[in-house]
């Protein structure tokens, strides 16, 4: 809801649209449908699955989700409630399938944070990390890892700055220091800075693709840490 409000404020003349806020555990009625929100874990804050009870049967829409017992934001996926809904009987499952064909288990974001800290600690110069602007958990992990290594952080990309501003207002950036401005960036030693920017999927309007690094030059030695895998249809 905070991101919706921020986006509307950034669009001159945008109509005021009423927004009803609900959270995990809530149930509400829309016409013939009863909808229950179930807590799940993902890279964005406050993700939920929706159990939609219809006259014909129960539909479970997972939204984006993963099993992470140690998330950096929010609570773990409510596996107990999902089992209960499964026992109730699900007519249709609409499920996020990203990386479903890959074998193995997705690492916890807490494990990723530890790896990031190790990479940043060993880097001889600047470190640049690309991620989705919506991935508040990863942005927080990178920022805290940078702080632990005595580095300051520069955000690049309008959507990322907007997301982080909202996340800070809502308390998701607790413990994260203020970020550098591009004006101050040039005065910070190369081994004392980390850049977080959009463009991990090759999006044409992202900070990386629009040559944002012309203003923030990465000369050798530096480390590029592009974490997200390519997602079909993302660019």
What kind of feature is each model-predicted range?
Residues 1-191, 200-219, 235:
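His/Asp/Glu-rich metal-coordinating catalytic cores
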Residues 196-198:
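Short beta-strand segments
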């Amino acid at each position: 809801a905070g991101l919706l409000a921020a986006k509307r404020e950034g669009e001159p003349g945008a109509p005021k649209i009423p927004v009803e806020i609900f959270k995990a555990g809530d149930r509400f009625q829309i016409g013939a449908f009863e909808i229950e929100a179930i807590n799940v874990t993902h890279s964005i804050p406050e993700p939920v699955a929706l159990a939609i009870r219809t006259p014909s049967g129960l539909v479970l829409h997972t939204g984006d989700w993963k099993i992470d017992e140690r998330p950096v934001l929010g609570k773990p996926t409510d596996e107990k409630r999902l089992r209960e809904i499964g026992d109730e009987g699900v007519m249709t499952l609409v499920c996020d399938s990203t990386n479903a064909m890959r074998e193995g288990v997705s690492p916890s974001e807490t494990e990723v944070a530890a790896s990031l800290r190790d990479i940043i600690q060993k880097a001889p110069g600047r470190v640049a990390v690309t991620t989705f602007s919506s991935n508040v958990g990863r942005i927080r992990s990178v920022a805290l890892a940078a702080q632990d290594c005595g580095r300051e952080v520069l955000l690049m990309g309008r959507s990322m700055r907007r997301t982080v501003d909202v996340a800070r207002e809502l308390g998701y950036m607790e413990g994260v220091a203020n970020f550098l401005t591009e004006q101050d960036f040039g005065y910070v030693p190369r081994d004392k800075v980390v850049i977080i920017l959009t463009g991990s999927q090759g999006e044409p309007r992202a900070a990386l693709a629009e040559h944002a690094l012309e203003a923030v030059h990465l000369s050798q030695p530096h480390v590029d840490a592009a974490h997200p895998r390519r997602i079909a249809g993302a660019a």
